[in-house]
């Protein structure tokens, strides 16, 4: 078992989705969620008094689609949160990138068969997994566009994708906000993720005395990570992990 900085029963778990809980797929809609994963996460959340949250770049509705269980979720890299499993959705007021940026990115993607844009509420992703030759040029285009409003927007490298996001939110702000309120407050944060976009969440967890774990280093693969979660759930259920 991965060592915790405290008794596991006192931890607050923050889990990335793509590349951590599920394997990366060719397209965002093609990820395969193991049938037993949602209920495993729901049981883990219950053992932790609700202090388990999915913290993802995905929109909240997609997280609800892939993980249709009552657990806390933060989507769009911290731009939308549901801190309590069945509670209300919370969204800070955020600007959207200029329409001209989206139009230029869309025209760029159209020139590379396989590349496409994924729209989000306050940003967009330019995916190039099926057009890898587009990656560097896409990065240069979006770097140039974001430089027009660097205080408001950030460009994040993701797995075979570039994402334009509001600068004021991140997985770090999501973890900090959740840790400020029940049932997360007072627990020791443990963030597990696989990507550059997870580093802000890991950093906040570490600064709070917890753990920021990179999946590849600590677990290897999403499958092995899911196995670890199942073992942890069993221990918490039997009361032998505290
Ligand atoms: O924060 P995450 O839960 O890791 O989500 C990050 C982004 O994941 C998705 O894109 C990535 O996963 C796809 C499915 O495996 C893959 O096809 C793509 O190449 C990856 O970049 C999702 O589409 C984004 O919205 C998330 O921000």
Question: What label would you give each PLM region?
Answer:
Residues 115-132, 153-165:
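Charged, glycine-interspersed solvent-exposed loop segments at helix/strand-loop junctions
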Residues 8, 167, 172-242:
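Mg2+-dependent phosphoryl-transfer enzymes with acidic/Ser/Thr/Gly-rich catalytic loops
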Residues 76, 83-104, 156-186:
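Substrate-recognition "cap/lid" segment bordering the active-site pocket of phosphatases
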Residues 32-120:
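Active-site phosphate-binding/coordination module
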Residues 20, 60, 197:
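Conserved Rossmann-like nucleotide-cofactor binding loop
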Residues 1-17, 21-26, 36, 179-180, ...:
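Non-catalytic pre-domain segments flanking phosphatase-related domains
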């Amino acid at each position: 078992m991965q060592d915790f900085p405290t008794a596991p029963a006192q931890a607050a778990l923050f889990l990335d989705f793509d590349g951590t809980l599920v394997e990366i797929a060719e397209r965002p809609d093609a990820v395969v969620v193991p049938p037993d994963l949602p209920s495993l996460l729901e049981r883990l959340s219950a053992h932790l008094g609700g202090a388990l949250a999915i913290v993802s770049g995905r929109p909240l509705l997609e997280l609800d689609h892939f993980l249709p269980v009552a657990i806390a979720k933060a989507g769009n890299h911290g731009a939308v949160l549901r801190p309590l499993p069945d509670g209300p959705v919370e969204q800070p007021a955020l600007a959207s990138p200029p329409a001209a940026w989206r139009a230029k990115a869309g025209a760029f993607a159209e020139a590379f068969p396989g590349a496409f844009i994924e729209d989000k509420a306050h940003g967009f992703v330019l995916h190039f997994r099926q057009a890898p030759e587009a990656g560097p040029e896409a990065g240069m285009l979006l770097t140039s566009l974001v430089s027009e409003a660097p205080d408001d927007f950030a460009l994040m490298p993701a797995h075979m994708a570039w994402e334009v996001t509001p600068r004021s939110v991140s997985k770090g702000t999501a973890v900090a906000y959740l840790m400020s309120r029940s049932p997360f407050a007072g627990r020791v944060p443990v963030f597990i993720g696989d990507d550059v976009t997870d580093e802000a969440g890991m950093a906040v967890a570490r600064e709070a005395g917890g753990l920021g774990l990179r999946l590849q280093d600590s677990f290897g693969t999403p499958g092995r990570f899911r196995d670890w979660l199942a073992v942890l759930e069993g221990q918490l259920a039997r009361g032998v992990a505290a």
